[in-house]
Amino acid sequence: PNCMGMLNTDPAVNLDVTFAPNYPPRGNVAMSSQSGALGIAILDYARQIDIGISSFISMGNKADVSANDLLLYWEGDPSTDVILLYLESFGHPRRFARIARRVNRKKPIVVVKSGRSQAGARAASSHTGAMASGETAVSALFRQTGMIRTDTLEELFEAATLMANQPLP
């Protein structure tokens, strides 16, 4: 519910079950959005700035697939080198932190977490029914896992462009 589909650019799969009119070229960046409408904008922006993606998944209300599931999948995906997340909430924060810490050692995770302001928290809650997490706890989770937190989608893609095209230390 509340999602807009998925996209996999692997030539062996080549699956597009989104509502997006266009999508970015094949590449090594995996993306996920908890917001369907924002997902379409993310795909369009990635196409405009020519960031190649390996896969894109819209999670919506996370009724079937969560960020935990996606991180586990992308951890073993040879087509994915960088992971981008747009999150409105965490389903199981401890499990998410444990998985993200491990995955982030091999593949950088860059995240935009909505709901930093009170208005943003209300919007996220009304959109997917997700409870907003406390900002202090969210910031601590990102620090402890080593994920890179960005404030805007533009910053998210700037970080992704750098990491997708430069060897990691």
Feature locations, PLM:
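Catalytic-core regions of core metabolic enzymes
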Residues: P1-P169
